[in-house]
Amino acid sequence: MNSLTSQELKDFAKNVVGVDAIGIAPIERFEGAPEYMSPRTVFPEAKSVIVFARRIIRGCYRGIERGTHWPSYQVFAYSGLTKLVHQANYRIGRFIEDHGYLSVPCPPAATLKEAGPRGPVSPGGKYPRDVNVSLRIAAVLAGLGEMGWSKVLLTPQFGPRQRLGLILTDAELEPDPIRINRICDRCKLCVRDCPGNAIDLKKGNTFTAAGVSWECNDLKLGKCKLTHFGLNRTTSPHFVKTFPGIYLPMDEQGNTWVEGWNFGHSLFNAVPTWKAFSAYPIAICGARGCIISCMNHLEKRRRIGNIFRHDFTNEKPWRLPEKPLVGHEDHHGFVYDPENSGEVTGSVKSDWY
Protein backbone atom coordinates (compact mmCIF):
# COMPACT_ATOMS: atom_id res chain seq x y z
CA MET A 1 0.00 0.00 0.00
CA ASN A 2 1.49 3.33 -1.08
CA SER A 3 1.99 6.22 1.32
CA LEU A 4 0.16 9.48 0.65
CA THR A 5 1.82 12.87 0.21
CA SER A 6 0.25 16.30 0.38
CA GLN A 7 1.08 16.96 -3.26
CA GLU A 8 -0.54 13.72 -4.42
CA LEU A 9 -3.68 14.57 -2.49
CA LYS A 10 -3.81 18.12 -3.86
CA ASP A 11 -3.20 16.99 -7.44
CA PHE A 12 -6.06 14.50 -7.19
CA ALA A 13 -8.42 17.01 -5.55
CA LYS A 14 -7.75 19.75 -8.10
CA ASN A 15 -7.14 17.85 -11.33
CA VAL A 16 -9.50 14.90 -10.92
CA VAL A 17 -12.22 16.04 -8.51
CA GLY A 18 -12.17 19.67 -9.63
CA VAL A 19 -11.91 21.60 -6.36
CA ASP A 20 -10.59 25.14 -6.76
CA ALA A 21 -8.39 25.37 -3.68
CA ILE A 22 -7.18 23.04 -0.95
CA GLY A 23 -5.13 23.48 2.22
CA ILE A 24 -3.87 21.29 5.05
CA ALA A 25 -3.43 22.01 8.75
CA PRO A 26 -1.69 19.78 11.29
CA ILE A 27 -3.96 18.81 14.15
CA GLU A 28 -1.68 20.68 16.58
CA ARG A 29 -2.99 24.00 15.24
CA PHE A 30 -6.32 23.21 16.89
CA GLU A 31 -4.88 22.94 20.40
CA GLY A 32 -7.07 24.89 22.81
CA ALA A 33 -10.21 24.65 20.68
CA PRO A 34 -13.40 24.12 22.72
CA GLU A 35 -14.19 20.42 22.93
CA TYR A 36 -17.54 20.94 21.21
CA MET A 37 -15.67 22.41 18.18
CA SER A 38 -12.46 20.38 18.26
CA PRO A 39 -11.49 17.93 15.49
CA ARG A 40 -9.98 15.71 18.18
CA THR A 41 -13.38 15.30 19.82
CA VAL A 42 -14.62 13.88 16.52
CA PHE A 43 -11.52 11.84 15.67
CA PRO A 44 -8.90 11.61 18.46
CA GLU A 45 -6.35 9.93 16.15
CA ALA A 46 -6.50 12.70 13.53
CA LYS A 47 -3.16 14.07 12.39
CA SER A 48 -4.25 16.38 9.56
CA VAL A 49 -7.23 18.61 8.79
CA ILE A 50 -7.94 19.06 5.08
CA VAL A 51 -10.07 21.99 3.92
CA PHE A 52 -11.04 22.55 0.29
CA ALA A 53 -13.09 25.12 -1.60
CA ARG A 54 -15.33 25.14 -4.65
CA ARG A 55 -15.96 28.55 -6.12
CA ILE A 56 -19.40 30.10 -6.35
CA ILE A 57 -19.95 31.16 -9.95
CA ARG A 58 -20.04 34.95 -9.93
CA GLY A 59 -23.08 35.18 -12.20
CA CYS A 60 -25.22 33.35 -9.63
CA TYR A 61 -25.52 36.64 -7.74
CA ARG A 62 -26.86 38.57 -10.74
CA GLY A 63 -30.52 37.67 -10.29
CA ILE A 64 -30.70 38.76 -6.64
CA GLU A 65 -28.59 41.84 -7.32
CA ARG A 66 -31.18 42.86 -9.95
CA GLY A 67 -34.12 41.66 -7.84
CA THR A 68 -35.37 39.41 -10.63
CA HIS A 69 -34.25 35.81 -10.07
CA TRP A 70 -33.58 34.02 -6.79
CA PRO A 71 -33.07 30.38 -7.91
CA SER A 72 -29.69 31.06 -9.55
CA TYR A 73 -28.25 31.70 -6.10
CA GLN A 74 -30.66 29.91 -3.77
CA VAL A 75 -31.01 26.61 -5.65
CA PHE A 76 -27.84 26.51 -7.74
CA ALA A 77 -25.08 28.33 -5.86
CA TYR A 78 -26.22 27.78 -2.28
CA SER A 79 -27.85 24.39 -1.84
CA GLY A 80 -26.76 22.97 -5.20
CA LEU A 81 -23.09 23.79 -4.78
CA THR A 82 -23.18 22.44 -1.23
CA LYS A 83 -24.17 19.06 -2.70
CA LEU A 84 -21.21 19.23 -5.07
CA VAL A 85 -18.97 19.91 -2.07
CA HIS A 86 -20.32 16.74 -0.44
CA GLN A 87 -19.60 14.80 -3.64
CA ALA A 88 -16.05 16.15 -3.68
CA ASN A 89 -15.67 15.23 -0.02
CA TYR A 90 -16.72 11.67 -0.86
CA ARG A 91 -14.30 11.31 -3.78
CA ILE A 92 -11.36 12.76 -1.87
CA GLY A 93 -12.27 10.55 1.09
CA ARG A 94 -12.20 7.44 -1.10
CA PHE A 95 -8.78 8.47 -2.43
CA ILE A 96 -7.45 8.82 1.12
CA GLU A 97 -8.90 5.48 2.21
CA ASP A 98 -7.45 3.78 -0.89
CA HIS A 99 -4.07 4.70 0.60
CA GLY A 100 -4.93 3.01 3.90
CA TYR A 101 -5.84 6.07 5.96
CA LEU A 102 -9.15 7.00 7.52
CA SER A 103 -11.19 9.87 6.07
CA VAL A 104 -13.73 11.54 8.36
CA PRO A 105 -15.99 14.10 6.61
CA CYS A 106 -17.21 17.05 8.70
CA PRO A 107 -20.01 18.86 6.83
CA PRO A 108 -21.03 22.37 7.94
CA ALA A 109 -23.59 22.69 10.71
CA ALA A 110 -24.62 25.09 13.44
CA THR A 111 -22.42 24.94 16.51
CA LEU A 112 -23.58 23.95 19.96
CA LYS A 113 -23.50 27.59 21.11
CA GLU A 114 -25.75 28.64 18.23
CA ALA A 115 -28.31 25.85 18.18
CA GLY A 116 -28.10 24.36 21.66
CA PRO A 117 -28.16 20.62 22.46
CA ARG A 118 -30.28 18.65 20.00
CA GLY A 119 -30.86 15.91 22.57
CA PRO A 120 -30.35 15.14 26.25
CA VAL A 121 -27.04 16.29 27.70
CA SER A 122 -24.74 13.31 28.30
CA PRO A 123 -24.23 12.31 31.94
CA GLY A 124 -20.93 12.69 33.74
CA GLY A 125 -20.19 16.22 32.54
CA LYS A 126 -19.59 15.16 28.94
CA TYR A 127 -20.45 17.49 26.08
CA PRO A 128 -23.67 16.84 24.17
CA ARG A 129 -23.22 14.80 21.02
CA ASP A 130 -23.25 17.93 18.87
CA VAL A 131 -19.62 18.50 17.91
CA ASN A 132 -19.20 20.71 14.84
CA VAL A 133 -15.86 22.00 13.61
CA SER A 134 -15.90 25.59 12.30
CA LEU A 135 -15.08 25.31 8.61
CA ARG A 136 -14.03 28.96 8.38
CA ILE A 137 -11.61 28.77 11.29
CA ALA A 138 -10.27 25.48 9.94
CA ALA A 139 -9.81 27.10 6.52
CA VAL A 140 -7.74 29.89 8.06
CA LEU A 141 -5.59 27.37 9.93
CA ALA A 142 -5.15 25.34 6.72
CA GLY A 143 -3.83 28.39 4.86
CA LEU A 144 -6.78 28.76 2.48
CA GLY A 145 -7.39 32.39 3.36
CA GLU A 146 -8.47 34.79 6.08
CA MET A 147 -11.68 35.88 7.72
CA GLY A 148 -12.84 39.32 6.63
CA TRP A 149 -14.46 41.85 8.93
CA SER A 150 -17.84 40.25 8.10
CA LYS A 151 -16.63 36.82 9.42
CA VAL A 152 -16.89 35.39 5.90
CA LEU A 153 -13.80 33.53 4.67
CA LEU A 154 -11.84 35.39 1.99
CA THR A 155 -9.46 33.51 -0.29
CA PRO A 156 -6.77 35.07 -2.50
CA GLN A 157 -8.46 33.63 -5.58
CA PHE A 158 -12.16 34.37 -5.07
CA GLY A 159 -12.55 36.64 -2.07
CA PRO A 160 -15.81 35.62 -0.32
CA ARG A 161 -17.04 33.47 -3.20
CA GLN A 162 -16.71 29.80 -2.21
CA ARG A 163 -18.22 26.87 -0.34
CA LEU A 164 -16.03 24.77 1.93
CA GLY A 165 -15.53 21.10 2.68
CA LEU A 166 -13.53 19.53 5.52
CA ILE A 167 -11.94 16.12 6.07
CA LEU A 168 -10.08 14.74 9.08
CA THR A 169 -7.51 12.03 8.48
CA ASP A 170 -4.88 10.06 10.36
CA ALA A 171 -2.47 10.60 7.45
CA GLU A 172 0.35 12.91 8.49
CA LEU A 173 0.50 15.38 5.61
CA GLU A 174 2.75 18.35 4.96
CA PRO A 175 0.88 21.46 6.16
CA ASP A 176 0.36 24.79 4.44
CA PRO A 177 1.43 28.08 6.04
CA ILE A 178 -1.21 30.33 7.61
CA ARG A 179 -1.80 33.51 5.63
CA ILE A 180 -3.87 36.33 7.15
CA ASN A 181 -4.27 40.12 6.90
CA ARG A 182 -3.68 40.19 3.14
CA ILE A 183 -7.12 40.54 1.57
CA CYS A 184 -9.64 42.44 3.73
CA ASP A 185 -8.81 46.16 3.79
CA ARG A 186 -11.55 47.04 6.33
CA CYS A 187 -13.57 49.02 3.79
CA LYS A 188 -16.68 48.11 5.85
CA LEU A 189 -18.94 47.99 2.78
CA CYS A 190 -20.23 44.72 4.20
CA VAL A 191 -21.54 46.76 7.15
CA ARG A 192 -23.15 49.39 4.97
CA ASP A 193 -24.88 46.96 2.64
CA CYS A 194 -26.03 44.23 5.04
CA PRO A 195 -29.84 44.61 4.91
CA GLY A 196 -30.20 43.12 8.39
CA ASN A 197 -27.76 45.55 10.01
CA ALA A 198 -26.19 42.42 11.46
CA ILE A 199 -22.52 43.34 10.89
CA ASP A 200 -21.16 45.66 13.57
CA LEU A 201 -19.23 48.70 12.36
CA LYS A 202 -16.77 48.96 15.25
CA LYS A 203 -17.20 46.20 17.81
CA GLY A 204 -15.11 43.14 17.06
CA ASN A 205 -14.03 39.79 18.46
CA THR A 206 -10.45 38.55 18.40
CA PHE A 207 -9.67 34.93 17.53
CA THR A 208 -6.34 33.36 18.45
CA ALA A 209 -5.15 29.96 17.26
CA ALA A 210 -1.81 28.40 16.35
CA GLY A 211 0.01 31.54 17.45
CA VAL A 212 -1.85 33.94 15.15
CA SER A 213 -4.71 36.34 15.89
CA TRP A 214 -7.33 38.02 13.75
CA GLU A 215 -10.34 40.22 14.40
CA CYS A 216 -13.86 40.05 12.96
CA ASN A 217 -17.01 41.99 13.74
CA ASP A 218 -19.26 41.02 16.63
CA LEU A 219 -21.94 39.58 14.34
CA LYS A 220 -25.57 39.81 15.44
CA LEU A 221 -26.53 36.25 14.62
CA GLY A 222 -30.26 36.68 15.25
CA LYS A 223 -30.65 39.55 12.77
CA CYS A 224 -28.47 37.69 10.29
CA LYS A 225 -30.68 34.60 10.45
CA LEU A 226 -33.96 36.55 10.08
CA THR A 227 -32.63 38.30 6.97
CA HIS A 228 -31.00 35.14 5.63
CA PHE A 229 -34.36 33.35 5.83
CA GLY A 230 -36.21 36.17 4.05
CA LEU A 231 -38.01 37.73 7.03
CA ASN A 232 -36.58 41.16 6.26
CA ARG A 233 -39.12 43.22 4.29
CA THR A 234 -36.44 45.36 2.65
CA THR A 235 -34.96 42.48 0.66
CA SER A 236 -37.71 39.86 0.52
CA PRO A 237 -40.58 40.61 -1.88
CA HIS A 238 -41.90 37.11 -1.17
CA PHE A 239 -42.45 38.06 2.49
CA VAL A 240 -44.10 41.38 1.58
CA LYS A 241 -46.49 39.72 -0.84
CA THR A 242 -47.73 37.15 1.68
CA PHE A 243 -47.53 39.33 4.81
CA PRO A 244 -48.10 42.91 3.55
CA GLY A 245 -49.18 44.20 6.96
CA ILE A 246 -46.45 42.65 9.10
CA TYR A 247 -43.80 45.08 10.36
CA LEU A 248 -40.54 43.51 11.53
CA PRO A 249 -37.91 46.27 11.81
CA MET A 250 -34.58 44.49 12.00
CA ASP A 251 -32.99 47.01 14.36
CA GLU A 252 -35.61 46.24 17.00
CA GLN A 253 -35.31 42.46 16.94
CA GLY A 254 -33.51 40.77 19.84
CA ASN A 255 -33.86 37.13 18.87
CA THR A 256 -31.18 34.47 19.05
CA TRP A 257 -29.93 32.48 16.07
CA VAL A 258 -32.08 29.47 16.93
CA GLU A 259 -35.18 31.66 17.42
CA GLY A 260 -34.65 33.07 13.94
CA TRP A 261 -34.20 29.54 12.60
CA ASN A 262 -37.39 28.26 14.23
CA PHE A 263 -39.39 31.36 13.28
CA GLY A 264 -38.36 31.04 9.65
CA HIS A 265 -39.19 27.35 9.45
CA SER A 266 -42.59 27.99 11.04
CA LEU A 267 -43.46 30.36 8.17
CA PHE A 268 -41.96 28.62 5.14
CA ASN A 269 -45.15 26.79 4.19
CA ALA A 270 -47.12 30.06 4.21
CA VAL A 271 -45.02 31.67 1.45
CA PRO A 272 -45.19 29.85 -1.91
CA THR A 273 -41.65 30.76 -2.97
CA TRP A 274 -40.20 29.74 0.38
CA LYS A 275 -42.19 26.51 0.38
CA ALA A 276 -40.59 25.62 -2.95
CA PHE A 277 -37.13 26.64 -1.78
CA SER A 278 -37.33 25.05 1.67
CA ALA A 279 -36.63 21.60 0.26
CA TYR A 280 -33.08 22.97 0.17
CA PRO A 281 -31.07 25.07 2.64
CA ILE A 282 -32.65 28.49 2.21
CA ALA A 283 -30.80 31.79 1.65
CA ILE A 284 -33.19 34.52 0.52
CA CYS A 285 -30.98 37.49 1.45
CA GLY A 286 -28.41 36.59 -1.20
CA ALA A 287 -25.49 37.71 0.99
CA ARG A 288 -25.96 41.28 -0.19
CA GLY A 289 -23.35 42.82 2.11
CA CYS A 290 -21.06 40.03 3.26
CA ILE A 291 -20.47 38.57 -0.21
CA ILE A 292 -21.77 40.73 -3.08
CA SER A 293 -20.49 44.11 -1.85
CA CYS A 294 -17.26 42.57 -0.59
CA MET A 295 -16.66 40.73 -3.86
CA ASN A 296 -17.36 43.85 -5.92
CA HIS A 297 -14.94 45.92 -3.85
CA LEU A 298 -12.11 43.37 -3.84
CA GLU A 299 -12.38 42.93 -7.60
CA LYS A 300 -12.24 46.67 -8.26
CA ARG A 301 -9.22 47.03 -5.97
CA ARG A 302 -7.54 44.00 -7.58
CA ARG A 303 -7.08 42.37 -4.19
CA ILE A 304 -8.08 38.90 -5.46
CA GLY A 305 -7.03 36.82 -8.43
CA ASN A 306 -10.32 35.94 -10.16
CA ILE A 307 -10.91 39.20 -12.09
CA PHE A 308 -13.50 39.83 -14.84
CA ARG A 309 -13.75 42.07 -17.87
CA HIS A 310 -16.58 44.13 -16.38
CA ASP A 311 -17.48 45.33 -12.89
CA PHE A 312 -20.20 43.28 -11.28
CA THR A 313 -22.22 46.40 -10.45
CA ASN A 314 -21.80 50.12 -9.92
CA GLU A 315 -25.26 50.61 -8.43
CA LYS A 316 -26.34 50.74 -4.80
CA PRO A 317 -28.28 47.68 -3.61
CA TRP A 318 -32.05 47.93 -4.08
CA ARG A 319 -34.33 48.03 -1.06
CA LEU A 320 -38.08 47.71 -0.49
CA PRO A 321 -39.83 49.88 2.13
CA GLU A 322 -39.42 48.47 5.62
CA LYS A 323 -42.83 49.71 6.80
CA PRO A 324 -46.19 48.60 5.37
CA LEU A 325 -47.71 51.04 2.88
CA VAL A 326 -49.59 54.04 4.24
CA GLY A 327 -53.31 53.27 4.26
CA HIS A 328 -52.72 49.55 4.15
CA GLU A 329 -54.65 49.12 7.42
CA ASP A 330 -57.86 50.41 5.74
CA HIS A 331 -58.88 46.78 5.26
CA HIS A 332 -59.82 46.75 9.01
CA GLY A 333 -58.55 43.21 9.24
CA PHE A 334 -60.85 41.81 6.54
CA VAL A 335 -59.35 40.00 3.56
CA TYR A 336 -62.37 39.44 1.31
CA ASP A 337 -65.13 41.72 -0.01
CA PRO A 338 -68.06 39.69 -1.42
CA GLU A 339 -69.88 42.89 -2.50
CA ASN A 340 -67.09 43.85 -4.89
CA SER A 341 -66.70 40.72 -7.00
CA GLY A 342 -64.75 38.95 -4.31
CA GLU A 343 -61.92 41.48 -4.28
CA VAL A 344 -59.08 40.38 -2.03
CA THR A 345 -57.91 43.26 0.14
CA GLY A 346 -54.71 43.67 2.06
CA SER A 347 -52.46 42.64 -0.82
CA VAL A 348 -49.69 44.84 -2.12
CA LYS A 349 -50.08 45.95 -5.74
CA SER A 350 -46.59 46.01 -7.16
CA ASP A 351 -44.79 45.17 -10.37
CA TRP A 352 -42.51 42.93 -8.32
CA TYR A 353 -45.02 40.13 -8.51
Predicted stretch roles:
Residues E343-Y353:
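Intrinsically disordered, low-structural-confidence terminal and linker regions
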Residues H331-V335:
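Charge-rich alpha-helical segments
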Residues Y61-G63, T234-V240, R301-I307, Y353:
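Short conserved micro-motifs at the rims of enzyme active sites and ligand-binding pockets
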Residues E339-S341:
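A cross-kingdom feature that marks long, compositionally biased intrinsically disordered regions
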Residues E28, I56, L173, D200, ...:
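Flexible, active-site-proximal loop/turn residues at the rims of small-molecule/cofactor binding pockets
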Residues A33, Q74-V75, L81-N296, D311-T313:
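Catalytic cores of enzyme domains
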Residues M1-Y90:
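Non-catalytic, usually N-terminal nucleic-acid engagement modules in DNA/RNA processing proteins
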Residues I292, K300-D330:
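C-terminal/domain-terminus segments
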